[in-house]
A protein has these predicted regions:
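Cys/His-coordinated zinc-binding microdomains
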Residues: 8-11
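Extended alpha-helical scaffolding segments
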Residues: 1, 6, 17-250
Length: 250
């Protein structure tokens, strides 16, 4: 009887997930021609670092350094600080310059009539596709692998690199940590840069890097999730951070 019902908290978590991993099987768009978003998190080769306790894990992944954009330092601007109309208009720029905005970015405009919400009954929501974030412009994302594109519409830019099904994380070691002197066509994940910066304060010299991502189907008209990919890589900090000529990273 209740397999299709949600509590209020479940519904809110579902809405958050929906914005990050939507696919493109829905049909409704605004009048303008644009590529619809599948959800920003959906396109990432997600990585994060775990410590020996919750505090370490939070500190290892909490990159508090904000990079300037030109001469300006971006102000953190999550979606709830804007009206619905402002968020929709903002989505058509294809850009986000701050992590709070990126992590609360809308892939869909969703209307739920608050007067009609009754979690004992079926809910009706109205959904409209919003434009894709430009992957070449969102390099503030700290929790993804990156690849340098040499041809096509993203030529000469870095874009997030998704994990490959059946491929162990250790095979991506060469793009998790980048040797000194070859940074031009290689981009290190932001959480690894941050971890190296704070490692002098960390007594735990063993590091566990985790990979997580959703795989979508091969149909370009749906992009429905079909599989979750999870892996991890445990290693000593020396292996990760010795990047000079005599170091481990080469």
């Amino acid at each position: 009887e209740y397999k299709s019902k949600m509590s209020e908290s479940e519904f809110l978590r579902w809405l958050i997930m929906l914005q990050g991993y939507f696919g493109i099987s829905d049909k409704v768009k605004f009048d303008e021609e644009y590529k619809a978003s599948i959800g920003w998190q959906y396109g990432l080769g997600g990585i994060f670092v775990t410590g020996q306790n919750l505090f370490e894990t939070l500190m290892f992944n909490f990159k508090i350094i904000v990079s300037s954009v030109g001469e300006n330092v971006p102000i953190q601007n999550p979606c709830w600080e804007n009206s619905g109309k402002e968020n929709i208009n903002k989505s058509f720029s294809g850009l986000e310059d701050n992590l709070a905005g990126l992590y609360t970015n809308w892939s869909r405009a969703i209307l739920v009539n608050s007067k009609d919400i009754d979690f004992s009954e079926d809910l009706t929501i109205k959904v409209v596709k919003l434009p894709l974030l430009a992957p070449t412009m969102i390099q503030i994302e700290p929790m993804t692998l990156w690849k340098y594109v040499k041809e096509g519409e993203n030529k000469n830019h870095f874009i997030p690199k998704k994990h490959e099904q059946g491929q162990a994380l250790w095979k991506s070691f060469g793009i998790i940590t980048i040797p000194s002197g070859i940074e031009g066509e290689h981009k290190e994940p932001g959480v690894i840069e941050w971890l190296e910066r704070i490692q002098i304060y960390n007594d735990n010299k063993f590091i566990r890097i985790n990979a997580v991502a959703l795989q979508y189907d091969s149909n370009p008209k749906s992009r429905m999730p079909i599989n979750e990919m999870i892996d991890d890589l445990a290693l000593h900090e020396i292996v990760l951070f010795e990047k000079g000529k005599e170091g481990w990273v080469m």
